[in-house]
Regions:
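Secondary-structure boundary elements
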Residues: 31-90
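Conserved active-site-adjacent core of cysteine acyl-enzyme catalytic domains
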Residues: 82-92, 96, 100-107
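Hydrophobic/aromatic-rich core segments of domains that either
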Residues: 100-175
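Low-complexity, Gly/Ser/Thr/Pro-rich intrinsically disordered linker/tail segments
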Residues: 162-312
Length: 315
């Protein structure tokens, strides 16, 4: 949905009727007039300050700049409700839920001249998805992509040392709807994945030997390796083969592999340690709650597929 510049003073509700081309916006003001003026002045100054270092960057770099700002500075928090759903939550308080984060992304990208709208999907209680979810669709180089800074933020925040994840940076429709529900209102078709982050950074592998080579480098240099697998479906059998190569690379450097997997997006994180610990695989699931769900299993105990993983989460 294109919401325009959603300011801190207004909450936009929408009503959409099946078989109707129209979407009805219903504004609800959260503060009195004086408070609204104060927030508008503060947010205008805040946005101007934040975008200043990024004004001469390319479209893709501007998008990454905004994404990284969210992941480095915003904590998911639904308790401050009047703030968390609006841009004053993320930009003024450093907190927000998916709605506030998506609005903040749009406001910042609008100010940087990058086309951006807000996308909303429905909930699905049968799958354990309690709430609607909000993210962004951006246009980079004339092509539309999905950008979900909230999901990347939840994946990166759980570790002792926060890291920025890019699992949901410029996805096409086929990728995003692996773990997002259908949209509740029309949005541009996203049919390209050329600007997907891991592909741009040459971390999207189609060959198993590339996984082994990069894992060996990570074990040798003590660096974290995060990569995307696009050499076919990430089935249990394929994942087992990749894990064996990751283990082999660690054995050659006397290191133990600690692996985490965002299964629906086929993104694998590998970190090697000198400690004598049992090899394990953490199955991650990004979501719009305060923390993402995860299940820790041994290398030999992989579930059959991602649906099996989701069943374990629901239990």
């Amino acid at each position: 949905i294109g919401s325009g510049l959603v300011g801190s003073e207004m909450c936009i509700r929408d009503r959409y009727y099946k078989d109707s081309p129209n979407l009805i916006f219903i504004p609800e003001y959260l503060f009195d007039k004086k408070k609204i003026c104060e927030h508008q002045k503060a947010m205008t100054a805040r946005v101007e300050k934040l975008i200043r270092p990024a004004q001469k960057l390319s479209e893709w770099e501007k998008e990454k700049y905004v994404h990284d700002f969210i992941c480095e500075n915003i904590r998911y928090d639904k308790l401050k409700k009047s703030y968390s759903h609006e841009i004053i939550g993320p930009l003024g308080q450093g907190v927000g839920v998916c709605e506030g984060i998506a609005k903040a992304v749009k406001v910042l990208l609008d100010a940087l001249g990058v086309w951006c709208v807000i996308a909303i999907c429905g909930n699905n209680p049968e799958k354990g998805i309690k709430y609607r979810h909000t993210w962004n669709i951006v246009k980079i180089g004339g092509t539309y992509y999905h950008l979900d800074a909230t999901f990347d933020n939840t994946l990166g925040k759980d570790r002792e040392t926060s890291e920025i994840r890019y699992d949901y940076f410029n996805l096409d429709d086929s990728q995003i709807f692996r773990d997002h529900e259908p949209l509740i209102a029309p949005a541009p078709h996203c049919g390209d994945h050329e600007h997907f982050y891991y592909k741009e950074k040459k971390l999207s592998f189609t060959k198993k030997e590339d996984v082994y080579k990069r894992s060996l480098q990570a074990a040798k240099k003590g660096r974290v390796l995060i990569f995307h697998w696009r050499g076919g479906y990430l089935t249990k059998e394929v994942l087992k083969e990749l894990l064996e190569l990751i283990r082999k690379a660690g054995d050659e450097k006397d290191k133990t592999a600690m692996v985490s997997i965002n299964w629906p997006q086929a993104v694998i994180r590998v970190q090697y340690t000198d400690m004598q610990v049992q090899e394990s695989v953490t199955i991650e699931e990004a979501n719009e709650e305060e923390q993402y769900d995860k299940a820790i299993i041994l290398f030999e105990g992989l579930p059959r597929d991602y649906e099996d993983v989701r069943n374990n989460f629901r239990e």
